[in-house]
Amino acid sequence: MKTHVKALVVGGGAVGTSIAYHLAKAGWQDVMLLERDELTSGSTWHAAGLLPYFNMSFATTHIHDYSIKYYKTLEAETGLNAGFSVVGNLRMAQTDARMDEYMVYATTAETCGVPYEWLSPAQIKERYPLVNCTDLKGAIFHPTDGYINPADVTMAMAKGARQHGVVIERKWQVDGYHWTGSDWQVTCTKMTEKGGNLLPSEEQIIITAEHVVTATGNHAQRTAKLLGLKIPAIPVEHQFIVTEPDPDLVAWRAEGNPEHPVLRDADAKWYVREERGGWILGPYERNAPARFEFGVPDSFRADLFPLDLERIE
């Protein structure tokens, strides 16, 4: 294993693999990525994968624009499908105030060059008969939005990074960062599996790196403690429900109809999208509990929290 690198990326989720890929694509030689478990095993693998083109921030919208165009090139470059579905995004409104809010969205979208379309309840019902429009005032539709499979896009970026010379090492945990004044001395411990838990072994190495980038997700507070910093990044519990196949939806798609857009109802506080003949329903929760303020337990790996439906009733 290499012990001297130009850039060391810590964390093998969607963010870490993207950083490693882009450094190598920009011409950086000698880049290494470390992941303490398996790629995507942290906060990446179970994300809903919503990928909006439009955002109320001008700068963020341009980042989204780059990302969407980039994801479309990954399969041609790596041979791996990133699971990107451009189905559109329908933001529905139950009140006049919400429609006024969407007018602001529209002006921002025009500034950023993002296409949009206004739809009345009747037009929504004509296009998507399964959508209940009885309480709607209208909607703004963004045809270039969609969703992506987080695990698939991470694996595609990891392969692309390797193709550009990045070395990816799994089962290595960073346990210390020391800045010498000219480079970083990064203490790494080999992780082993015992009884379903991921535990540190006695094998350690020190990697010398000119640059270190941390993308540790759920482990951000541990990273901050190792660096002597305070990072305002705390994982917050989010839940979504994946339904069984919906007979009405299955019949709709069997007739050759297109996939529904991502449906967002800010007044009802839900987003919905299709998933394998059924639906993913995600609530916009208030006061969702924070997690891992003091570190991630050894027993928590690619796991889910217990469902708490009472919190979203």
Regions found by a protein language model. Name each.
Residues 58, 62-65, 92-101, 141-163, ...:
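Short beta-strand to alpha-helix junction loop
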Residues 2-15, 32:
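Beta1/beta-strand and adjacent pyrophosphate-binding region of the FAD-binding site
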Residues 230, 246-313:
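Active-site lid/adjacent beta-loop-alpha segment flanking the redox-cofactor pocket in flavoenzymes
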Residues 141-211, 219:
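Helical element adjacent to the flavin cofactor pocket in flavoenzyme catalytic cores
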Residues 12-13, 17, 36, 216:
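Glycine-rich Rossmann-fold phosphate-binding loop(s) that bind the pyrophosphate
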Residues 49-127, 267-272, 276-278:
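Dinucleotide-binding Rossmann-like beta1-alpha1 core, especially the glycine-rich loop
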